[in-house]
Amino acid sequence: DYQTGDNVISPLINLNLEINDNDRLIIYGKSGSGKTTLLNILSTLEIPSNGSMIFADKLIDSLSDKELSNLRLNDIGVVFQSHHLLEEFSLHENIILPGSIAHNLDKDFANFLIEKLKISNRKDHLPDQLSGGERQRCAIARALINRPKLLVMDEPTGDLDRNTSDEVMELIDDIFNEIDISVVIATHDENLKFKPNSKYLLEQGKLNLIQG
């Protein structure tokens, strides 16, 4: 909940969501439905004011800031609609940065991601030298570099045209088939090329299962 003037706003209402190992979930919702709030909670960027979140047997609101930071670095990957790449770093440097920070960089896995996402010929380019699809593929590789247990994606292809969106989703779907990871995607795009095992609709803060 948050306060706006005299009103208390509840972006999410009586929401229960369980994510199991290797789950593939998609959450549809229009702008203002609460998608971003939900994904911020799943990625521990926000702590719910009511209720609780448990991740890997850890009660999130009981963790210190340092513990939350380590959890995000090692166990939760996040991809936003905007790529948030560091403009002064090359594509390759952006991808390996979280691994370097965590002191557990797997160079072979980095090369695997770069090859799978078909950006190996662009690895030395800066973000402003890349296409929108290439920048987003870089952001996806960066989110996966530490082999997180959970990948959270907020409108991951929202800035891309249909053909580029389909291409990016096909490439990452291929990666998902080769690694152990749970994936949650929030989108308004009902034609997103993704094969979930569960589909949800988020409307006015209420989450409803529509398939799965």
List PLM regions with ranges.
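Helix-to-loop junction immediately C-terminal to a conserved catalytic motif
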Residues: 43
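Conserved ABC ATPase signature
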Residues: 126-136
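A short, proline-enriched helix->beta-strand linker immediately N-terminal to the Walker B motif
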Residues: 145-149
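Catalytic Walker B motif of ABC-type/P-loop ATPase nucleotide-binding domains
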Residues: 151-154
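Short coil-to-helix segment of the ABC ATPase nucleotide-binding domain corresponding to the Q-loop/switch region
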Residues: 89-97
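ABC-type ATPase nucleotide-binding domains, specifically the catalytic core motifs of the NBD
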Residues: 3-5, 96-107, 116
